[in-house]
Curated annotation (Swiss-Prot):
GO terms for molecular function: mRNA binding. It comes from Arabidopsis thaliana (Mouse-ear cress). This is Polyadenylate-binding protein 4. The gene is PAB4. Transmembrane segments: none annotated. Residues 558-635 form the PABC domain. Pfam families: MLLE, RRM_1.
Amino acid sequence: MAQVQAPSSHSPPPPAVVNDGAATASATPGIGVGGGGDGVTHGALCSLYVGDLDFNVTDSQLYDYFTEVCQVVSVRVCRDAATNTSLGYGYVNYSNTDDAEKAMQKLNYSYLNGKMIRITYSSRDSSARRSGVGNLFVKNLDKSVDNKTLHEAFSGCGTIVSCKVATDHMGQSRGYGFVQFDTEDSAKNAIEKLNGKVLNDKQIFVGPFLRKEERESAADKMKFTNVYVKNLSEATTDDELKTTFGQYGSISSAVVMRDGDGKSRCFGFVNFENPEDAARAVEALNGKKFDDKEWYVGKAQKKSERELELSRRYEQGSSDGGNKFDGLNLYVKNLDDTVTDEKLRELFAEFGTITSCKVMRDPSGTSKGSGFVAFSAASEASRVLNEMNGKMVGGKPLYVALAQRKEERRAKLQAQFSQMRPAFIPGVGPRMPIFTGGAPGLGQQIFYGQGPPPIIPHQPGFGYQPQLVPGMRPAFFGGPMMQPGQQGPRPGGRRSGDGPMRHQHQQPMPYMQPQMMPRGRGYRYPSGGRNMPDGPMPGGMVPVAYDMNVMPYSQPMSAGQLATSLANATPAQQRTLLGESLYPLVDQIESEHAAKVTGMLLEMDQTEVLHLLESPEALNAKVSEALDVLRNVNQPSSQGSEGNKSGSPSDLLASLSINDHL
């Protein structure tokens, strides 16, 4: 067998980074393109990629190391933005290609901090690196083969663009590597010359590189000889298995798998001598009954292959199921805990033929308060949407909508938010307390973080305190809390009949002492996650829940009180009432973005918001979904022009919602 002889000298266009398991040239944005024997076009500034750096190598150390050869223009060790730790690679810029070539020839595969480094010309053309043209996979390498040895072994077959031996976290060879040539012809030449040859006393395999998806697809099409059989009777023996499968061809082995005590695990493997016999046995025996048990017989697969196949089947089934039930399957939530599958079916039976009906439950069997109902016709489902959404059942308003997969909902939300224009936020107003005029309870509550509260006279009506206009700050802190029914002062004067406002001097109101002011977050999360009536508050002062970081807000009302108030309120007032009850609950889950998340949740249907107030689990899920959307939208918004203030992240986030029905 031929022995591969590595040349004693070489002029290497050196290796680069492994991408998806393949050795590829490296690139860096914003750095001039270099060139050399690898065919990379040279620019005025020649940039070298330096890989496999020790994590302790600094910019200054890299600069000094490369300056020993030629004068360096600049260097950069790439680091993690969050932790500032080295990523194990960097870039060195020279003023001309001659200096860069000298550095490559002298320093490539040299040791820095006890670790061999790799150098290649930096290329910004990612298409060439990712195409896979000329890329080879080499396996069965001896542990002593490193990047330099592999490069020397293949350098006689053509111009090498990159070369890499895969290593573990300890730096030890994994026994395989990748070599990429500049042309496909050079790669084919290497396969013909080196495949099956011996390198460092081991026969190596050289073949075209295939990505994981391509390898798995090719494996599915390959013939097989090993057969997996399950659902065996506990009494089935190896000999019986061999006799049954032996009818279809020659068998090299047959075994029933057993545990440590020798008890059958009810599955086994049969290995045929040729794939045609194995395929015939699978076709004949799969699904056949033995000892009143139906056998499953199929190709023996690795765990990764089984998981991939199951994933494909699930995705295909979900896709087919989604198409099959489009417009027929309804999602119902805010169900009472006592509702069973039968009760849910009875509730919707009057609208048409129900093909399936299920209440979702946790592992302990407790209802999750939601379920699914599928009808035989789209017209029946449409009737349910029109008549049952918002209907009170068991003291709760039902939420009914067309069922959607999670991926579809998320895609819909992302598409919606990307088209929404940023909301305009008013500028900063005068530094003075603002009172809401007109009827009690007509103030607009805006859920944005503000400073300490001004004087806030309590107003009867819908159980909330008027708030500041966004951007305003109070001129002072503290003030008396008026009792219910007590008339609050008007700012600066009063109107007599239809005449003009007359100025009146008002008595200054005493400030509250610091020890009288509420401390920390004054609201409470109702017991069990449900909105329960609050107990009476002692004293003549009206307590105001107050957060040192946000606007003041009132204690959440019970479900009954809230439903009554909503029934008598205008749409604008309904939003404020829901916001007052929702904000404290959101703040306990995510205090940093509570204002933005609350605003997003308020864009949903009223029945769904009421469900969130009743169900901590549903609220947690929606808050998590809202936070994901905030993060995703914040990333593209940061790329906008600095001069376009309306496109700033804060403006974009202020305009978001997670209403599935917009």
